[in-house]
Design a protein with these regions (language model features):
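N-terminal accessory segments
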Residues: 1-72
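Short alpha-helical patches at coil-to-helix transitions and adjacent helical residues
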Residues: 57, 86-91, 113-116
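Alpha-helix boundary/capping segments in eukaryotic regulatory proteins
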Residues: 83-89, 99-105, 110
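Residue-level preference for the first positions of well-ordered beta-strands
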Residues: 74-76, 105-107, 158
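Conserved nucleotide-state-sensing and coupling region of NTP-binding domains
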Residues: 109-160, 165
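Contiguous, well-ordered alpha-helical segments that form the cores/surfaces of helical PPI scaffolds
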Residues: 61-65, 87-99
Length: 166
């Protein structure tokens, strides 16, 4: 039985699609390494299943990117509850920052030790994600210091979590 030309075309189209998809994924990962909003779009759905982008997320993300680059020195974010402040500022941004600067120290302070530890756990878990490794290859956690409130990278960086109240 001779191969059908339509089957051959279909197989080639599938292979072309797979190659294009792989190339696009690599480009997005490269962009996520340098652009925080791209990182947010890629990683936020891992934290919130029904994640939706809003203009306020784009504005905050741009300001956080400027903070990381040193363009601005301080940033205060004021938004109503349930506006994704914690997801962006206390989970995704520290993960992106440590991916770009794995030798730095980060301190997260919240109103309670428990909330700070919860943030630390989320950031640590993001750093352990396979997608994070694709973006920031080579950044990994030390196996001997991995508590939610204090963990270290193999590059010498440290994440600390502290609360104003116990």
């Amino acid at each position: 039985m001779q191969p059908n030309i339509n089957d051959e075309v279909s197989n080639n189209a599938v292979l072309d699609y797979m190659e294009l998809h792989q190339h696009l994924s690599e480009k997005v990962e490269e962009e996520a390494k340098i652009d925080f909003i791209t990182f947010v779009r890629l990683m936020a759905p891992k934290l919130i299943s029904d994640w939706k982008m809003g203009k306020h997320i784009e504005v905050i993300s741009e300001k956080l990117k400027q903070l990381e680059s040193g363009e601005i020195k301080r940033l205060m974010v004021f938004l109503p509850p349930r506006s994704s402040k914690s997801v962006i500022c206390s989970k995704l941004f520290p993960a992106w920052y440590i991916g770009r600067n794995p030798e730095h120290e980060i301190l997260t302070v919240s109103h309670s030790d428990q909330l700070s530890s919860d943030f630390g756990r989320s950031v640590r878990d993001l750093v352990n994600e396979e997608d994070f490794s694709k973006i920031f290859g080579g950044v990994s956690l030390r196996s001997d210091v991995r508590a939610a409130g204090k963990w270290k990278t193999t590059q010498g960086g440290t994440y600390y979590a502290a609360g104003v109240r116990p």
